[in-house]
Amino acid sequence: MGSIENPEIMASTMLHILPLAGKVYGITGGASGIGLATAQILSRRGATVCIADVDPKAMASAEVYFSGQSGAKYSITKVDISKRSEVNAWVDGIISQFGRLDGAANVAGVIGKIHGAVPVSEMDDDEWDKIVAVNLTGTMYCMRAQLRNIVDGGSIVNVASIHGLKGFANHAAYDASKHGVIGLTKAAAQENGAREIRVNAVAPGAIYTPLMQKNWDITGRPKDAPFDDPSAFRRQGTAMETGNVIAFLLGPDSTFVSGSVYSVDGAWI
């Protein structure tokens, strides 16, 4: 006797296997590091991922990865998040192509050319303006466009930093920008609660990514130098470990979590 397929059981099974099937997420900085890890996790769970990035080499590598994944639904767009028009066009394009926006991870950020090397008294105006324009104003541009288009019950996760929770000497511009991201997150969470739109942040500590390597290049730190960050876990974290926390906050298991900042730092001391 042939089996009779129950559509409700089949749908339930698919949701268990692919809990984000039918969902559409935007990820800035999504072609490398934490952004790419987040996009990969969401895609594996069935979501459509819409990546924004500015690095052509990283974007090409991401294209190779996602085009090689059976059934992956994705788009990759060149977007400078410090430019309002590019951000708006990117989000409008998501709606036009995929019909909805269920959530977003705002990961894109810069550390500048003097990260960890210059005190406030020596701060360069252009360096300050660039870091704030991308990390803080750019995140606001993204949030604004996303909140105007996101579905009720959607979720936005902003990537702040341990630098948004503490102050570090010779990191003034980066610290200020990441403190600002946390302030934006908490304000937007209050403003959008009536629609049950969740807005949270993650604060990564020592996570090995291309951005961390750039910082080491600036300060002259060898890649094989002994671990020296004040973390109880005596190692750097990974982009995938951070992406898993972001995916949790974007997904269906965090529906009463908003206005929070999740540290991903191996117990920073």
From Swiss-Prot:
Protein's UniProt keywords contain DNA repair: no
EC number(s) reported in the record: 1.1.1.-
An example Gene Ontology molecular-function term: oxidoreductase activity
Keywords: NADP, Oxidoreductase, Virulence
Protein name, entry field: Short-chain dehydrogenase/reductase ABA4
One GO process term, biological-process aspect: abscisic acid biosynthetic process
SUPFAM superfamilies from the UniProt entry: NAD(P)-binding Rossmann-fold domains
PANTHER family for this protein: DEHYDROGENASES, SHORT CHAIN, ESTRADIOL 17-BETA-DEHYDROGENASE 8-RELATED
Pathway: Hormone biosynthesis
Cytoplasm as UniProt keyword: no
Its biological purpose: Short-chain dehydrogenase/reductase involved in the biosynthesis of abscisic acid (ABA), a phytohormone that acts antagonistically toward salicylic acid (SA), jasmonic acid (JA) and ethylene (ETH) signaling, to impede plant defense responses. During pathogen-host interaction, ABA plays a dual role in disease severity by increasing plant susceptibility and accelerating pathogenesis in the fungus itself.
Pfam family, one: adh_short_C2
Record-annotated active site: Y174, K178
InterPro entries: NAD(P)-bd_dom_sf (IPR036291), SDR_fam (IPR002347)
Phenotype caused by lack of the gene: Leads to slower vegetative growth and dark pigmentation of the mycelia. Also leads to the secretion of a very dark pigment. Affects sporulation and appressoria formation. Shows hyper-branching of the germ tubes, as well as unusual bulges along the hyphae with less melainized appressoria. Significantly reduces the production of abscisic acid (ABA). Highly reduces virulence.
Chain sites annotated for binding NADP(+): I34, D80, R144, Y174, K178, I207, T209
Induction summary: Expression is up-regulated in spores.
Annotated TM spans: none
Family: Belongs to the short-chain dehydrogenases/reductases (SDR) family.
